[in-house]
């Protein structure tokens, strides 16, 4: 299973399947989750072989109709990721609160470092 498909399977149930990589659909329904890669750690060894495990810095956004709903989903995301079967997950700080005036929605953003086995 790819990292993207595993994230979709893990995060989707928290918002009725509305978890998307990178961008929202054209006509989004809320609440929803957006996740995107934002770099990560890459390590090489003297023998020139790549490590078996890969690392991805993941930014996870929640958009919802209320602050309470956005915060609750963000908390569930942290629990789902940190209790998942990824080899290691590290939250980089707590969620940041957001508000998007153009769509009148409340949001959060939190970054995680995820070690995973590529498929």
Q: Residue locations for each model-derived region?
A:
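Short, positively charged, low-complexity/disordered linker segments
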Residues: 56-81
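Oligomerization/assembly interface segments of phage tail-like spikes and tubes
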Residues: 52-65, 106-117
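Sterically constrained small-residue positions within well-ordered secondary structures
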Residues: 26, 49-51, 99-103
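Acidic-leaning, charged glycine-interspersed low-complexity segments
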Residues: 79-119
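Short, low-complexity, polar/charged sequence segments that are solvent-exposed and flexible
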Residues: 38-41, 52-57, 79-83
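Glycine-rich loops and low-complexity Gly/Arg-rich segments
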Residues: 44-46, 57-62, 84-88, 116-118
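A generic structural signal for short, non-catalytic loop/turn and secondary-structure boundary residues
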Residues: 27-28, 53, 84, 105
């Amino acid at each position: 299973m790819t990292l993207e498909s595993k994230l979709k399977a893990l995060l989707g149930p928290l918002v009725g399947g509305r978890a998307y990589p990178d961008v929202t659909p054209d006509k989004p329904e809320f609440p929803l989750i957006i996740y995107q890669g934002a770099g990560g750690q890459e390590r090489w060894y003297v023998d020139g072989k790549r490590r078996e495990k890969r690392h991805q810095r993941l930014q996870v956004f929640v958009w919802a109709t209320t602050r309470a709903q956005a915060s609750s989903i963000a908390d569930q995301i942290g629990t789902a990721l940190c209790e998942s079967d990824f080899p290691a997950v590290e939250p980089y700080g707590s969620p940041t609160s957001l508000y998007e005036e153009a769509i009148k929605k409340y949001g959060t953003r939190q970054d995680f470092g995820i070690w995973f086995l590529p498929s």
